[in-house]
């Protein structure tokens, strides 16, 4: 008689975070676990708790290469500040395969903005807007980003227009 109890994602993530080679451990996971964004998010967060941000970033990038997840992309972006140029390059490689992914285009805009590449940021945000449907609630966030870009470019009038559009959408 064997009564196997499956560990929850948090427990498994804590165990996995102790491994020195996260990519090797990821590859060894069952396919269903590789696709489990809750597990991968918990694992990345456990790595962060152990002061292993670079390992968390590598794990998330590898997982995103393997299976796309907006949730993992958002977590990856939070860690992408250490080397913005490398992160921008990584996100651009994903965009080659996902050229109309509005969330990825927004991430590219955010990274370009952080890197002081205002024109590129503006272009990414505008392309992200075009990829969204007319009623998409994410438009408010993109308008907010565009307002920040125009503010950085010194065009306060345009910045205000975008900030007002963002506010208008956010209140409806």
Q: Where do the protein language model's features map onto the residues?
A:
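Repeat-based scaffolding regions
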Residues: 1-172
């Amino acid at each position: 008689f064997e009564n196997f109890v499956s560990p929850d994602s948090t427990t498994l993530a804590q165990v996995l975070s102790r491994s020195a080679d996260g990519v090797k451990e990821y590859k060894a996971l069952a396919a269903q676990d590789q696709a489990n964004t809750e597990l991968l998010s918990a694992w990345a967060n456990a790595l962060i708790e152990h002061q292993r941000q670079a390992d968390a970033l590598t794990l998330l990038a590898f997982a995103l290469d393997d299976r796309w997840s907006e949730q993992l992309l958002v977590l990856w972006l939070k860690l992408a500040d250490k080397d913005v140029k490398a992160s921008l390059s990584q996100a651009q490689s994903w965009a080659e395969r996902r050229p109309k992914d509005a969330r990825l285009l927004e991430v590219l805009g955010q990274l370009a903005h952080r890197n002081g590449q205002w024109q590129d940021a503006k272009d990414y945000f505008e392309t992200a807007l075009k990829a969204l449907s007319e009623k998409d609630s994410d438009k408010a966030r993109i308008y907010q980003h565009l307002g920040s870009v125009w503010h950085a470019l010194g065009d306060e009038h345009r910045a205000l227009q975008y900030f007002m559009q963002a506010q208008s959408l956010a209140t409806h």
